[in-house]
Amino acid sequence: MVVPTEPERGEQWVLRYFDHVFPVAEGTQSLPMHVLVGRQHYRLAYWKVGDAETNYRRFFDVGTLAAIRVEDPEVFAGSHELVLDLLRAGTVDALRVDHPDGLADPTGYLNHLSEAAGGAWITAEKILAPDEPLPVGWHVAGTTGYDASWRIDQLQVDPGGAVRLGALMHELTGRGPIEYERVVEQAKREVINGSLAAEVN
């Protein structure tokens, strides 16, 4: 099947599976389907094995969001062309960068982005621990506001409800609020050993 893409590239062959669209490597489009699938730059796999067999970096455990090498100037230029065009046209005024600390070089990336964006207002979606500062070298206006909303939430929560919430926590987990740090650590380990196992191993 062919679909039109950018005018300068003409038409391209793609594989479609419901709403998934996969590019077809040049020169393989005339092969029988079972051979064609084996000759691509990717391997199709049953979705339930993704956590065990993934061989690329993902955004957490979201299989459709692959990490790309934005530290490579060509990759940066190609992946940011539309966003920077929208900024220059005044269609968007600011940028939000989700989880930049997952990048190979977050400081270098944010500096490069700030320069390419002409000093546009940029925020980083980074959830800071209560005693964690935003890295000084990041060229961002600040975070997207989770730390501020946490403080605002605290103003609106009645401290008298702590006993009832503690009882609910004990009912749901078998542990009390005093063990909160242990519960958090256990949850993090479950994620690392479960949905992120392919990235760790």
Q: What do the PLM-derived regions correspond to, one by one?
A:
Residues M1-A94, P100-N201:
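Alpha-amylase-like alpha-glycosidases and glucanotransferases acting on alpha-linked glucans and related
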